[in-house]
Amino acid sequence: MGSNISHYLNRFKACLKIDKTIRDGVAEELCTHLEEKSRELEENGLSKEEASKIAVQSLGSPELIAQQIYETHAQGSWKEALFSALPHFLVALLFTSYYWQNIVYVSIMLALIVGIAIYGWHRGKPIWIFPWLGYYLMPVVVTGILLLSLPEGWGWIAALIYIPLALFVFIHIVRQTARRDWLYASLMVAPMLVTLTWFSSLGAGNELLRDGMWLASLQTNALWIVISFIALAAATIAFIRLKARRYKIMSLLIPPLVILFSVITASRGNIDYWGWLILLFSLSAFAIPVWMQARAYQ
């Protein structure tokens, strides 16, 4: 394979954000086509370098070809879209029916989510897995926040021990996801965005656990919480079904706005310093991958 062809294929694969198996298969087909074209040109008297250069130029921009192939393969089926949104609908159903107060139902749902996430992870990471992974990581994030409710001094000591381990797990999974596509990383952290923003509005640490105040707050704000998860489900369905990458990016920018509006409206702006810090952190964690891909798209 000539250097021109190799460079062309590397650019093509770098721009094509689809399943690795499909991407490698398409790249192999392109490679075969380019090598055949190059051999034909060599038989007509051109040097190997000139032949490979003309073959590459005749095929066109690798970025444009990658975009066209992406739009062909990026659209998921309705089955994949609905299954991707299913965990959001299940959580919304929990709050609608008030089953979130029943530890049995919550435990069953958590076990279901963990099982499906592990199954999907070991089955090649299909497109529907990423929202499920977000809920799979949820206990890791929530545990870190609840550690701050320990007696003064002990909470920070426990957090200093726990947080590095939690970050290791979180970063490992995010990196594995981002290798396929940064947009999937945003799709994955979306459930954590909702949870952290509502934590910030309901209180944190001792305030969250004291005298059942958080239960009363959850009951009061249940409708807004349901709206947040429904918005997340709708955006997930749109993301899976849309073809063009720019529209996928736009669909992921809608939930943060809906959730931010819901939280501020429900709390009437009464969010303390730590609450705003958690809120801004969670919004940034969700929006940064989308912003990076928007810049890359431009």
What are these regions (language model features)?
Residues 76-298:
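Hydrophobic alpha-helical bundles in membrane proteins
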Residues 67-79:
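Charge-dense, low-complexity polyampholytic segments
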Residues 1-70:
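Soluble N-terminal domains of membrane-associated systems
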